[in-house]
Amino acid sequence: MATATSTRYETIIGIEVHAQLRTESKMFCGCPTSAPPGEPDEPNTRVCPVCLGMPGTLPVINRRAVELVIRTGIALDCHVETEAVRFERKNYFYPDLPKGYQISQYALPLCSNGRLSVPVPAEGADVSIGITRAHLEEDTARLQHGGRGYSLVDFNRAGVPLMEIVTEPDVRSPAQARAYGETLRDILRHIGASDGDMDTGSMRIEGNISLRPMGSSGFGTKVEVKNLNSFRSLEHAMEFEAERHAEALERGEALVQETRGWDENGGRTISQRSKEEANDYRYFPEPDLPPLRPSRDWIAEIRDAMPELPAARRERYEQVLGLSAYDAGVLTADVALADYFDRVVAAGIGPKSAANWVTGEFSRLLNQHAADGLRATEVALRPEGLAELIGEVDGGRVSGTNAKTVLATVFASGESPRAVIEREGLGQVHDAGLIEREVAAVLAEFPEQVAEYRGGKQQIYGFLVGQVMKRTAGRADAKLVNGELRRQLDG
């Protein structure tokens, strides 16, 4: 049934994304952005006078962070400013902001006026979404609310390089909002700008929504929704708000410009505070930082070194390698998995066979280690090792079933699959005489099933094949087994 939202009002959505940049040090000081591998991230251990906002300290711009925002701007078809990029102070008070202001960009951002084509599977079409800006700023500290009348502040996150990406109000449905977020995350991961992990807060997303009567060109009262920890939450929050706005408009009620939070358990939004405007933050130029002027030569170097973007990679997989749209989508949704697949193919394996194994059994094993944060490129079994195993299967030297057993062994050990096959005696049996004897033994052992098959019960055939494979520990050549079984059953 059509709702008031779909029949009388047009949904207008703009999206803001904050993504932590993949740098080793913070935005304006030399403190590390993460704890050393294998060590606990103790609170307030990755701090210095600069990121704690001590008087007399001066910020120094992180060149790598600037490069990653330029790379993002290129990927989003933005204009990259070369004349004067200005840092500004965004003034507000909150316990997680040690200086009492945040160094950001406002009037003169690094990247602006971009555009992104977004496939929307739920609508069966692509939409073009304008990118207003992509700029640099510093992250805030992390508050830990203990529920005992006070909160704790961990300043390890304070000063971590942050990129804010803001869209034009071009999004017209909750499904488009979700698709935009997923597409942007894939791009950021492919170009190495951010890990895009919403679970850890390294990528945070907010939706701004309003409704207007169909055919109108103005804008309605805008509401911002926060506390969105997944793209699914974004979609559901926008659906809820669209219906809430439509119902209020139908009743003639005035909507309030405000910030609301998404209640995942309740499936609704909750009012948090009135929505701030830009002038509430009293932006003014950061006096401790000169204007930033990226050279055209440097921007050209970054452009020339750009990795393949997800859309181009997906097209290559489908048009050049002949993969299905589904397999291409699964691979490009995980840049590490796609990189692993490319190396398997480079090792001489056919693309379709490689895709079957990488998106199938290999991904299943990878998902078992999801809690450890293991990525495809970090697995002990190198792509060349998986290519060796697939080659053994394609060459008929090991069965698919036994190959899965081998993969489970070498996935974590990194051993040569060929060595494991030989050591465990898992190689495929091609001895026609042996297979003939094993088939005869199975038919003698199961006379009732043989009679049922010969009486027309075709599904018994699979049972008989399974018994032959069981007697040979899964090593018999399936093609020879089928041929011999047919010969003896029909002879």
Say what each PLM segment does:
Residues M1-E308, Q319, A325, A346-G350:
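Basic, nucleic-acid-interacting segments
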Residues G373-A387, G391, R397-R471:
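Strongly charged, low-complexity linkers/loops
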Residues F155-V160, M198-I205, M214-S217, Q428-G491:
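C-terminal non-catalytic interaction appendages of large macromolecular assemblies
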Residues W298-A305, A312, D342-I349, L386-V398:
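Extended, non-catalytic structural segments that build the interaction scaffolds
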Residues G322-L323, V345-A354, G395-V398, G455-Q459:
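Structural motif
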Residues T200-P213, Y281-R282, E318-D342, P351-H369, ...:
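Core structural elements
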Residues R22, E243, A338, T359-N367, ...:
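Amphipathic alpha-helical core segments of compact helical bundles
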